[in-house]
Amino acid sequence: MLVRSIHLTTRRYVTCLILAAMGISSLSGCSRQFWRKQADKDTYNNIGQKLNDTRWELPRIDLIPDGRSRFFDPYDPDKEPLPPDDPAAHVFMHSVNGRRGYKSWHKLGASFAIENPNWLENYGIDMNGMDPVAGHSEVKLLKVTLPELVDLSYIHSRDYQTNLEDLYISALALTQQRYNLGVRYLGVNGSEPFVDGTATTLGNGRANGFSTAAFGVSQLLPSGGQIAVELANAVTWNFGQGGSISAPLLGYSVTQPLMFRAGRKVVLEPLTQAERDVLYNARSMARFRQTLFVGVSTSYLNLLLQRQLILNQLNNIRQLEEQYEKQKALDSRIPGFVTEKLENFPQLRQLIPDDLKARFTYDDLWLKWDGPMSEEDEQRLLSLSDSDFYRAAIQQLIGWKNQDVTSLASYQLLTQLQNAQATLATQRRVLADSQDSLKRDLGLPPNVQLDINENGLAPFEIISWDLIELERRMREIQKNLGKQLLPDLGENQADTPPDFATLRAYVDGLVELRNDLREKGINVVMNDLKPIEDLLNTTQDDWKASRPDQRFFRSEEERNLLVQNYQKDKATFERAERDFMFGSDQLDMLLRLIDVETQDDILKTLDSDSNGMIESSELPQAWSDLPRLGTKTAADTYTLDAFLSEVRDGSRILRDDYLLRLAQQLEVLQAGLRVEAIAINRFTLPESQEFPEIEQVVEIGLENRLDLMNNRAQVMDARRRMEIAANSLESTLNLTFQGSQGLSGGNRILDSNQTARLEFTTPLDQIDERNAYRASLITYQRQRRSYMQSEDTISLNIRQNWRQLQVQEYRLEIDRRAVRTAALQYDNASLLATAVVQQGAVNITLALNTLLNAQNTLAQDWVTYETNRLNIFVNMGIMQLDPRGVWDDPFYLQMNDLQDDGTVSPAMTPGVVLPNSQPQN
């Protein structure tokens, strides 16, 4: 019975131990979620304490990305499903080196995508549980403004998220350092609270047990001392006798270093550095937001520039094509008069038939033919003589008449055109590459369809596209209808009357073009005069008094030059207006004269005396002013055919000189006016309208650059680390007091135990410490030099930006004049290119290249100026951003119709075009 009782008692004890172990296991620790949320609470609190200056305020410190972000994680962060894995590598999770792996990897499930599986839903794309990578190409972001690009970067930018996480990690490290100096649950020996139990079965059938439990607290003092108090209890069970012995004990320990690791400068250093690191990272995050805006803005401006270069190149190609077509038309003209040398053949004069003498002559040296030549004429000429010399000369004469000539000018223009087309292809490739790079920087896939809003190109549309299109239509009507009225063969043809229906359609078309020229040419150019007039009126008394939205003058001489140009432009416009009114009246007259159903109705309308002729007295008085070919004047009487021929000739001259030529003049005038009106955002400091001095902006930069503040503080960090390294060279001298006191009822005062200990270590084996100290001295000197270099680099960058801004201001004034000059040069060269006798196409190709280069340089210099303005503000560290990350500069706020006092929210949604939407206008 006794043995059985012992076994039962042992079994109960073992059962108790198992139950106790199970209970203890339930106290193994708090959940992952608890610790994560606690870490977030402490960390965000630490970050918030450092955001105590407006210069490094942050609109967001939460690590959780925007729900629309591509890398937003929709799953429980503490119970993440397994992401997609590489199939070959995944095998080793289930079997490694012949051993079965962990079998419960998939208990939380598996996701089908690494990126946010729902992020495409914001763009109207439902992937139905498929990897969103397959839907990237369906995303369409059209006409995205710069503020919207910044929004996209805050939603999707990986670099922004990484910088935010760096700030969080530094603040997380700070929580550890603060905790180290607080009350910790560590006992006298640095152990955490514990319970330890042991059960023993003896060979004689007896059993006993032993358990130990301890709970203590300690605190590290700023001076380096450490205080610890611990309550421990030891219990012994004797199961055979049914008794137990308990021995509770209260212990304490006080340790104070006196040399090594002693003093506040050593003990508080980790906490000091951690506090400073959070401040550094907060400033770095604020600095990153500034550089992020500058980076996105620079990319946006460069895309605008590349697009403008493409538009300029397209216009250049259009002009080259026009000139090439004109040159081919000149080349295709059949010569009316040709000659060929034939010496000493006097008998030919008697052989020429009388009916050919009007067209074929010989002066004993040259064979001459004037007019058209038919195949019958060719055979008759060949039959006049059997002389080999004569027949060879006649064959050459016929060849000159029938040859298909391609002039040198045509080849030059064609070569220039082909080069321009090749350049355009390269420019389009560069634009596409730049767009893909921007998408990557924003955090978007490169195959997303993203186009930027091109409203920023409006100032560089120096010639209205409507006016350019109108000029093209004027050429088209001549190509389609004009040649039907009088084929341009270069022959002395009989005055064949035009087809009435074609003539009527031609005049109707010219009237329509005239109306469009009034609306898209005269009226538009009239409006282009107003900004210049307004600018001159604003600055009449003070040349510096231009408004922020207007062009400013660098000197009074610059304004005076604009006054002169404006007066010339206004006089040119007034002449063009008068010419337009004259041509318009003439067209109206022609339209009234032929506004009948058939050409026979013209006589019925105009022939008042019914004599079958149209007399000058029966025509409007303005008829005598109708432009005519050569030196022709109005006749006294006209047959119907002669009248229609004169209407045809007059309408064609009106098209050439009073519509097409006037449109070209308006283009040149418009280019000059618009280029004068282009404004730049002048570099000024707040509450000032003057260009600041270079030393002033450098001083501002050295005072406000956040990264320089960090660099300056890091010099002090290196200096403090010298002291820490020096402390490690000292001897170890620690004073320790320890004691314990039994707490059982029978304990007496003699049961307590008190100990005092003095610990000393000689500093003899200190090579590592010596080297560390010497290295800290070098590190400090390096940090000093690094700060000086940072200071000098900032100063250098600001000075370079300042000089570049001044140079760009000057260059832009030169660019204005260059565009004016190039437009006039092309206009003159275009007129000369229509001459029958040319020396190649050097003038026209040179003029086109000059105009293209002037337009490109203007756009490039403007973008370079604005880029440097961005850089100098960010280099000075005074770029203030709104909550979305957009600079509170009026130029950038107006891109989204915001004002200086406009309220905005972070991460506004850019305009989204759904996959099945209607085409954009």
Model-derived segments and their meaning:
Residues 18-26:
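Hydrophobic core
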Residues 29-31:
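N-terminal Sec signal peptide cleavage junction
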Residues 67-152, 691-694:
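Regulatory alphaC helix of protein kinase catalytic domains
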Residues 163, 167-174, 288-313, 323, ...:
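Amphipathic alpha-helical coiled-coil segments
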Residues 171-174, 179, 185-188, 192, ...:
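Hydrophobic, small-residue-rich alpha-helical packing segments that form membrane-like cores
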